[in-house]
Amino acid sequence: MNPNQKIITIGSISLGLVVFNVLLHVVSIIVTVLILGKGENNGICNGTVVREYNETVRIERVTQWHNTNVVEYVPYWNGGTYMNNTEAICDVKGFAPFSNDNGIRIGSRGHVFVIREPFVSCSPIECRAFFLTQGSLLNDKHSNGTVKDRSPFRTLMSVEVGQSPNVYQARFEAVAWSATACHDGKKWMTVGVTGPDSKAVAVIHYGGVPTDVVNSWVGDILRTQESSCTCIQGDCYWVMTDGPANRQAQYRIYKANQGRIIGQTDVSFNGGHIEECSCYPNDGKVECVCRDNWTGTNRPVLVISPDLSYRVGYLCAGIPSDTPRGEDAQFTGSCTSPIGNQGYGVKGFGFRQGTDVWMGRTISRTSRSGFEILRIKNGWTQTSKEQVKRQVVVDNLNWSGYSGSFTLPVELSGKDCLVPCFWVEMIRGKPEEKTIWTSSSSIVMCGVDYEVADWSWHDGAILPFDIDKM
């Protein structure tokens, strides 16, 4: 064969292979259309898988078209039943890590919100981390000046517990610079406070829809808990403050059903100061450990009954748990009166364990750094100084901040008692560090039947960020 004949032969074979390949594709398409055309779905094959998760049914509808699969998630809530939440708090020996969001570390290169006041609350099927955003992202120019507490850009949003407060997984809850949220077993209720200092309004959402409002009645920065509210047998309770932060203010307990207020009562507490209460259900009542921003370095205690009757006083323990505070040895404790003259304060929490109390506090007496939780024998009912357990969560070389309480409902934990849990905010940036922003991450701990070793689950972000160097 001469060279020209070889070229012609190779070309003919190649052309034949191409034609054969095209014919195979045509036949494949014809056969596919004929087979799918015999079905009742006009070429679309649908399959439905239903999985039940407690009170929720999640439907996955799978649609196949040739080589493409589309999975469409169709959420469906069957209404569920109200959580009971009348059980007692479980007696625990220590607290184990539940989650750590690492929000600021991730935010150095990820789309993470600038936040403060994070907290956790649980439904029968999940726990969610709530937080107040500043309407801006970390490492962005809009993060400048976010040390400010109240602005029209602040919103309450949430993610599944353990996730960073990122743009892609966060769910909008309310416009708010102060907030609380809780689940009654059927739907989430949120309370978001927003507006001007003199005429702030709290908007109540139930199932994502605005259902009621509370207007400022004093005209001096209406505010609420910055942690989980409490639902018992379908009714949800929370505490609000209106008035000065450094002298006598006014305090109210609210009760709602399906997002609509069905009761309220004023708390008479002359000489005492209540704000930013950390509340939880226990033995059919709501127990709250709050912040005295006026004088006391001991914490106010508010116990609420379903009929809105209440008992108010101070955490009896002879060891102070607010910051700033004096030396433990010089503190006497009181069940009825504020002790100390430090003023200011920080949001904190405590859990009653019979007559004992678990109480969290910063390790530093003067600044928001370090965090520990102490068990004081008979500290709920007496001015006891007997510390029977201590666990370090954040060492004193690292920043902490607010802390608060929540519980795991029996529907979620499978126990016959309510598991006590708490979160610790770890504030970074202004005013302590050289940045243009203020934000925080958080560690979450839950009670267990075993002692847990001391460690420091601190924030660990390396500052300043790029935006701070511009």
Swiss-Prot record:
Post-translational modification, as annotated: N-glycosylated.
Q: Name one GO molecular function term.
A: exo-alpha-sialidase activity
**Activity regulation note:** Inhibited by the neuraminidase inhibitors zanamivir (Relenza) and oseltamivir (Tamiflu). These drugs interfere with the release of progeny virus from infected cells and are effective against all influenza strains. Resistance to neuraminidase inhibitors is quite rare.
What is said about the domains? Intact N-terminus is essential for virion morphogenesis. Possesses two apical sorting signals, one in the ectodomain, which is likely to be a glycan, and the other in the transmembrane domain. The transmembrane domain also plays a role in lipid raft association.
Question: What is its biological role?
Answer: Catalyzes the removal of terminal sialic acid residues from viral and cellular glycoconjugates. Cleaves off the terminal sialic acids on the glycosylated HA during virus budding to facilitate virus release. Additionally helps virus spread through the circulation by further removing sialic acids from the cell surface. These cleavages prevent self-aggregation and ensure the efficient spread of the progeny virus from cell to cell. Otherwise, infection would be limited to one round of replication.
Summarize the subunit comment: Homotetramer.
Which HAMAP family does the protein's record reference? Answer: INFV_NRAM (MF_04071)
User: Which protein is depicted?
Assistant: Neuraminidase
